[in-house]
Amino acid sequence: MSTLTLAKAKEILKMHTTEDHLFTHAAAVSAAMGAMASIFGGDKDHWEAIGYLHDVDYEAFPHEHCHHVREFLEPEGVDEEDIKTIISHGWGLCSNEVEPTTDIEKSLFTVDELTGVVMAYALMRPEGISGMELKGLKKKFKDKKFAAGCNRDVIKQGFAMLGMEAGEVMQACIDGMTAHKDELGLK
């Protein structure tokens, strides 16, 4: 088995996903994971691949999310460590199989929800994500009615798991997503 690449992750996701919004979310999480890899000294392409593929079973099994990851990824030659990393993002939400313990797992757990807040804020701003300031994102994050579907408790739990300040992780998401704004359909 070889290291999962972003190109391979994109191939695999196309086999199991048809909904545009899931591809956009995959790209957002991938972009944020690339930024987190830079913080932790990880392999950027690999971290982006994990982020891109994290919801591989969601469209087929929305009510059993994370429970079918292995059956989708083992036949594609994805190694066990990567499968466990992907499953870990559902810890306490839809699966208790793998608790996030590594930097990559904790990052995925955190940015999965956080990218939703960043995306919602970017979509409401006339200038999109370009020039987005941390101060504005923090203000929106505190407003529980804004992007209400994004679980703030999970995001805060992720900050604590990572041992990082909220602003540091938020800035990584902004930076990662800004670098991929065209792919995300943002200005």
Language model: regions and residue ranges:
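Acidic/His-rich, divalent-metal-binding segments that scaffold phosphate/diphosphate chemistry
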Residues: 1-61
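Conserved active-site and cofactor/substrate-binding residues in soluble primary-metabolism enzymes
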Residues: 4, 24-28, 64, 102, ...
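Divalent metal-dependent catalytic cores for phosphoryl transfer on phosphate-bearing substrates
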Residues: 40-146, 156
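C-terminal binding/interaction regions
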Residues: 134-135, 141-179, 183-187
